[in-house]
């Protein structure tokens, strides 16, 4: 079943990347569909993917400056309200929130 799904995904990507399908070559790919498409496009090269896992933060605590519980680092930042203006440029932003094509996917291969 998984092999059939992979073959079908590859076929869809090939059809969408053909010269006659330029208007339909971009599509939204999210979640497992995005991962499957990356597996198909990148093949043996692979791609950068790390599933979310819980990390131990204890080793990182040594990098933090000791502050009292009442102090808040965000209060010291004069432009804290403009923090929402950050531009996200990851594969989810590029291929899930906006349509992407096979060439966009190739940019994420190793």
From Swiss-Prot:
Gene Ontology biological process terms from the UniProt entry: glucose metabolic process
A Pfam cross-reference name: Insulin
Keywords: Carbohydrate metabolism, Cleavage on pair of basic residues, Disulfide bond, Glucose metabolism, Hormone, Secreted, Signal
Primary residence: secreted
GO cellular component, one term: extracellular space
Protein family (similarity comment): Belongs to the insulin family.
Name the record gives this protein: Insulin
Organism ancestry: Eukaryota, Metazoa, Chordata, Craniata, Vertebrata
